[in-house]
Swiss-Prot record:
Region Disordered: start-end pairs: 127-167, 247-272
Family: Belongs to the krueppel C2H2-type zinc-finger protein family.
Gene3D superfamilies assigned to the protein according to its UniProt record, in alphabetical order: Classic Zinc Finger, DNA breaking-rejoining enzymes
Protein name as annotated: Zinc finger and SCAN domain-containing protein 21
Example GO biological process: male meiosis I
Function: Strong transcriptional activator. Plays an important role in spermatogenesis; essential for the progression of meiotic prophase I in spermatocytes.
Domain of life according to the entry: Eukaryota
GO molecular function, one term: RNA polymerase II cis-regulatory region sequence-specific DNA binding
Record's compositionally biased regions (Basic and acidic residues): 258-272
Gene name for this UniProt entry: ZSCAN21
InterPro entries: SCAN_dom, SCAN_sf, Znf_C2H2_sf, Znf_C2H2_type
Keywords, ordered alphabetically: Activator, Differentiation, DNA-binding, Isopeptide bond, Meiosis, Metal-binding, Nucleus, Repeat, Spermatogenesis, Transcription, Transcription regulation, Ubl conjugation, Zinc, Zinc-finger
One term under GO cellular component: nucleus
Zinc finger (C2H2-type) stretch: 277-299, 305-327, 333-354, 360-382, 388-410, 416-438, 444-466
Amino acid sequence: MMTKVLGMAPVLGPRPPQEQVGPLMVKVEEKEEKGKYLPSLEMFRQRFRQFGYHDTPGPREALSQLRVLCCEWLRPEIHTKEQILELLVLEQFLTILPQELQAWVQEHCPESAEEAVTLLEDLERELDEPGHQVSTPPNEQKPVWEKISSSGTAKESPSSVQPQPLETSHKYESWGPLYIQESGEEQAFAQDPRKVRDCRLSTQHEESADEQKASEAEGLKGDIISVIIANKPEARLERQCVNLXXEKGTKPPLQESGSKKGRESVPTKPTPGERRYICAECGKAFSNSSNLTKHRRTHTGEKPYVCTKCGKAFSHSSNLTLHYRTHLVDRPYDCKCGKAFGQSSDLLKHQRMHTEEAPYQCKDCGKAFSGKGSLIRHYRIHTGEKPYQCNECGKSFSQHAGLSSHQRLHTGEKPYKCKECGKAFNHSSNFNKHHRIHTGEKPYWCHHCGKTFCSKSNLSKHQRVHTGEGEAP
């Protein structure tokens, strides 16, 4: 009937965009009179995500229905792979947003994740402007749905919509075909679903509903501002620094910035490699908390890692792992003199005995050492440094091993026990000397004549015969 009044053909088929202004208005009004609206991508997405297994009689039917719902949402027949991928990325991006930001972004109907990011960045820039207020300024541009709902056609009820002259409906020309036939609705919707949604809003909402939405949007905007400020990188860093200061028992400094006074200062973002974890005992700084924890054990003497074989304790797990290899039978690193080692570093140190290689030299006396640790321990002879002190008697030692051995005099501990005869020792060196009685091992080799000895002291006595200092034993 309506097509006859307007002089249209009774059957409407696809036409070029410039010829579809008339049927566009007619079909929109007919749909509104019936109370039917085009489905949205969001509705199809929700139908796919909320589909339940119990809605179908069996697993095959459930899988088939899921395929149908997925195709209704992603539209693989008209969307490219890149467009489908972008829809999935957009969905996940909206999912990880805070609830307040989700609602705000969805109101703006972004068609891609990049568009959603642009919306959020624009909002952040708006919040960073000086003198920003939570309430909407008078000259602020209204949201899209507010603009449409404030038009004259939106104030009329759907039943009162009348056909408009062609010259007043040019604003719909750029939207493309919306309603052509019943079978063409989905194709028209796929071209621009957001504008169909805007058209639906423009003919459905009344003025009272618009005012209520504007009030809700105002409250939502305040929540959005709080979420954005709380989730800014500098705010997260500020919370971390506050937690770090709380561990030290200090309060972070306060500063005045603009119109906000008493607010905690926001520190700058730490640069890579910055050492923010400081030892309260000596002031040494570290780039991460785990290294600081390990360092603190040098002050407390804590040794939480204990060997289950001999009871020896270590401050680091890596040292315990290296030590535990000494109890294993497997010693894959062999020296040509017959001695075997569990670690390649120990073999290298041992081989320096044969080559007389001593790359680490003392600057004070010129004495050379095969290991860097030996040089450090030797250097304390010149400085007189004895950093390790016994808590029982106050005696100090230049080496930690000396303190550990001394403390066993107070405790009576003898952790080194011989499996052959059961004899126990409080020093590993004494245990090693004793153990060679059972094994017949002679690890100390004279590089002049090739003779071997079971102890270093016997080798020293023997070498005097080559240097002319005394007779060989």
